[in-house]
Amino acid sequence: MKLKNQLTFVFIASLSGFITLSVSNDTIKATIKASAASQTLRILNWEDYIYVPESDEDEPSIIDQFKDDYFERTGQRIDVVYDTYSTNEEMYSTLTLGSNNYDLVAPSDYMIERLIRENKIETIDKSAIPNYLAYASPFLQDLYEKHGWDVYAAGYMWGTLGILYNKEVTDAIDMTTWKVLWDNKYQKEISVKDSLREGYFIGLAYVQNEALEALKVEYEDGLLTAVDYNEAISNLLNDTSDETIAKVKVALDKLKGNIYGTEVDQGKNDMIKGTVSMNTAWSGDAVYAIYEAADAGHDVLRYSLPLEGSNIWYDGFVMPKGANKDLAQAFINFVSDPKVAALNTNYIGYTSFIAGDSVLENINSYEGVVETPTEDTYELDLTYFFEGTLDTMDIADAVLYIEPDYVGGRLTTQYPSADEIIRSAVMRDFGDANQKVIDMWAEFKATDGQLWMYIVAGATIALLVTYALYSFITKNLSSRRRRYALLARKK
């Protein structure tokens, strides 16, 4: 009996240990499962287009914040693969020719149109992006709907193309027209974007200047509605007829002799260093340059949108065919939170589609913004952007007053006025004229100076190759002669 009791005890103890071990193993497996990534979100975005920390004291990156937020809401760990590109065309090639299957990309307006036309992207389930519906500016949502982009895309960033200038060495009044780029008063002090579309645009603005000025007068005289005015400007600034392309080529050839050069990404740094005094710039790059120059003690850079008309652009998130829609839409919803949007805008310089209290509070803290207007302050009415998105703040808070010296600074660069938007055009896809514009731009880029550099470089390479071959042959002949001499001695 005693033995039986002992055996029973041993059995129960063993069973207890087995159960304990089983429970422990199950717990470990569950923990491992929870910590291991169950899915991977693959994002392809523009370079320098999302917040990342610069020190250990900074907030975590938006990518890391999203991963943590997703885990808190679902209990699932995810991975994020984040790749970048520098042009829409590079992105398009990656999507169509590459082997990577991305879930989310952020093309510009004209490229969104192309991807829709070619049936390369998925539709968006708007019920999955409540933050976007609640906080994306209704003005921008309406614009997406007008173009038919809203079915496929959710806006991410938007901005303009204008003139970044040094107010200490240029006249601000000159910056109100694109014609200043051709003014020999600023010869060799100007850099322009090494970009086919932006290059063609400034050429168009120069060629169409008289027609654009005439439209402006008609609008100001009440002969055109805002909608009709914007449509007329858009048609002029999207003209790709053979006659217009030829005129733009002549204009750009003339511009060639007046500029310091073209640049891809160096323009903002050249402005900060004072290498040039004027640069055709995207608004986000202008914000970066303005801020960095001021931070270095030289608050001399400002940004202008020419009065005859400018370019306005919109980048949006789309999901390529076969994307993980649930994960992609979860990310869109996360970055559409106003707090995340404010963090993003402060870091990259570009303007988020997202409005809301956090964003409005953020820009009210910008330099040059004052609470009480005076005779000299500039009124910037942003109710068009924030209306319908504020939870606690009053819409009257979206009317900001700026000290005169800060007009053209960070705030007015990031947030153009309603009047500036009316006279700005979205650039469309060039369509069948694309190759003609490409050829025209290539001819513009092939300046005499560049051709001479290519000739010199080619001749130098040819000489080096010839010398290397000569040295190789001479060395081998000498070696052979030595071997023959040794053999002759042995004989």
Where are these regions (language model features)?
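Mature extracytoplasmic/periplasmic domains
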Residues: 315, 320-413, 417, 464-467, ...
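Extracytoplasmic/periplasmic substrate-binding proteins
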Residues: 67, 257-322
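Conserved C-terminal helix/tail region of periplasmic/extracytoplasmic solute-binding proteins
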Residues: 388-490
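Surface-exposed intrinsically disordered loops and tails
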Residues: 81, 134, 138-145, 217-237, ...
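Extracytoplasmic ligand-binding site segments that recognize negatively charged/polar headgroups
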Residues: 46-60, 108-275, 289
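Sec-dependent N-terminal signal peptides of Gram-positive bacterial secreted proteins and lipoproteins
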Residues: 2-26, 461-471
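Sec-dependent signal peptide cleavage junction
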Residues: 20-37, 472-476
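Early extracytoplasmic/lumenal segment of secretory-pathway proteins
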Residues: 32-118, 451-453
